[in-house]
Amino acid sequence: MWKLKIGDGGKDRNIFSTNNFVGRQTWEFDPDAGTSQEKAQVEAARQHFYDNRFEVKACSDLLWRFQILKEKNFKQTIESVKIKDEEEISEENVAITLRRAVHHLSTLQSNDGHWPALNAGPLFYFPPLVFCMYVTGHLDSIFPYEYRKEILRYIYCHQNEDGGWGLHVEGHSIMFCTVLNYICMRILGEGPNGGKEDACARARKWIHDHGSVTHVSSWGKIWLSVLGIFDWCASNPMPPEFWMLPSFLLKHPAKMLCYCRLVYMPMSYLYGKRFVGPITPLILMLREELLTQPYEKVNWKKTRHLCAKEDLYYPHPLIQDLIWDSLYIFVEPLLTHWPFNKLLREKALQTVMKHIHYEDENSRYITIGCVEKVLCILACWVEDPNGDAFKKHLARLPDYLWVSEDGMTLHSFGSQTWDASLIIQALLATNLIEDVGPILTKAHEFIKKSQVRDNPSGDFKSMYRHISKGSWTFSDKDHGWQVSDCTAESLKCCLLLSMLPPEIVGEKMEPEMLYDSVNILLSLQGKKGGLPAWEPSEAVEWLELFNPIEFLEEIVVEREYVECTSSAIQALVLFKKLYPEHRKKEVENFIANAVRFLEYKQTSDGSWYGNWGICFTYGSWFALNGLVAAGKTYDNCAAIRKGVEFLLTTQREDGGWGESHLSSSKKIYVPLERSQSNIVQTSWAIMGLIHAGQMERDPTPLHRAVKLIINFQQEEGDWPQQELTGVFMKNCMLQYAMYRDIFPTWALAEYRRRILLASPAVAI
């Protein structure tokens, strides 16, 4: 039976930590664990998900919940309430619903103070890891039978009815993910016509019906070249010499978005080496199964620009293809032959590996994310199959694996700190401080221990890194990568908790550590007044013309984001209240410029585009909160009035809100097709309206929405998993499994605190 271990570093000498593994979460299979009843519960959950996989495509993350609720002997002792038509919403009913939610949410907390949860959804994450382990000869040791079974379960659970796989679990089938998952099944032991419900045959038919494997997008071409199914001539050039360019150039790596930089860094190494794994009998079979003509007869260079229409979200501009062709025809032949292969190529490869090792060491071999992690593992193995770097990478693989009722997947990377910072604020909003004191104490300790205390090592600027001292990451301290909104939300938590008695919530954070957090937020503000996510946004935006990834957008350079800007405003306004003299003028200027940015980013319909949540509902909640925190009101700010109008006009018949993930991709508001609202998005809208003072004008829309949330609460005190509500790079959706617990609780808390405590009963 699968068990989640918290804060466990294991006994591998190749793993190390900066904070004793606080926040680390790793799954382990124990054949002797679990009673027959517990195993039956898990099997029932698996079967239920599979039977309903086309109705609700995101899992409910039940295996961890089963485990922790059992360990803590959880039983919901507070009876539920339901609000009937025309019945009044009383403070008592809301308080009961809140206490049920808090009781359940508190039980889900781990011993080190965070809330473990799934953070996944893309379907191109896991197959490359399987490919990497196959190529390096470590497939059997890393993925024994029970692991393979769960990986395959996940693949089967998320195969679309047409036989393909989407970019994410709710997406339409695309060539990239269908090819990757087909090959993954074959490597894991399924025959050409094997797999559950003819999974392999159906997938192969989809591939051939949509232009064949040569129409896979660029990342697919790279991985198939590594495997030996394609020739490297099918890939556009990724010369490692790029990393030797002078820093004054506009297209220097230092000016790239960190994720783009750290994906193409190991890719350029593999390309520069033209690395190909062992050509095994299976690889030869895959060539026959996927290609429509013999491998030797394929004109590989003509496939470079092929891409299935289903994959094509960001078509390459003509200028980009011209550059690829120029590099392919004129530059690469020079760099791969004497004397340039000795003078430049070998030196460039060494430079790239220097950067890879630096990034690995500064993230404790977690790396910035799962896509980069797998590529860096392979690059380290290619450089030295017996080297320490490869061994250290393997030791950190468990940090990415997650098991749910739909099988085993890879996290983007954990959301430990992000989730904890939101939950703390939700619990504080309940005003049930005596009920949640011990929970807040542990969470407070986790947040304090998770702050990054140092900048990256050595001359970090020469390695294209920004300061990180005082920041918080998305996951845990060991990860090391500063994130602006995670820093702002965690700083806000520390400030809020410092205002409560230490005997209830623990000792407050030292002021110097708070100052460090303020420093990093101030350092990140861009020219437009907004905040990027990771590093200063210094590059020109037209560099996006060179985005080589067909299925993502705004991936080349760092941008300024509404959500990050709002979080920073809220944190710095509170900081200014508690520490009014620290960098006073700079903080005031920051807030003023950030407000102007939020007003500038508002769309014509009054909404704000959300970059990290779906979509205009999410962005509008953040923007309204930021503007109000800065002192703006409905009466004195046209942006708030327009934002409120947008939310009111998108409220649905059942009282809630429901926005499709297509809003993110199409960049226009698209409602959910089904009539039922999304509880998480409803919660965002409620909080946005409350902060904008809707209760003072007409509270009826709020009452209708809260009634929906109360009536949707489940027996144990949580809410059901519905559609995905996270997103990145415009087109790829992400599941935050804790959102269904966090935001309804938070919205009810704000409603009770700001409305009902002043009005004993409300008729709707």
Curated annotation (Swiss-Prot):
Keywords: Isomerase, Repeat. One of its GO terms (molecular function) is alpha-amyrin synthase activity. PFTB repeats lie at residues 148-189, 514-556, 591-631, 640-681. Pfam families: SQHop_cyclase_C, SQHop_cyclase_N. Its EC number is 5.4.99.39, 5.4.99.40. PROSITE patterns: TERPENE_SYNTHASES (PS01074). InterPro entries: SQ_cyclase_C, SQ_cyclase_N, Squalene_cyclase, Terpene_synthase_CS, Terpenoid_cyclase/PrenylTrfase. GO terms for biological process: pentacyclic triterpenoid biosynthetic process. It comes from the Eukaryota. It is an enzyme of class 5 (isomerase). It catalyses: (S)-2,3-epoxysqualene = beta-amyrin; (S)-2,3-epoxysqualene = alpha-amyrin. GO terms for cellular component: lipid droplet. The active site is at 485 (proton donor). Belongs to the terpene cyclase/mutase family. Multifunctional oxidosqualene cyclase producing alpha- and beta-amyrin and several other minor triterpenes. This is Mixed-amyrin synthase. It comes from Pisum sativum (Garden pea). The gene is OSCPSM.
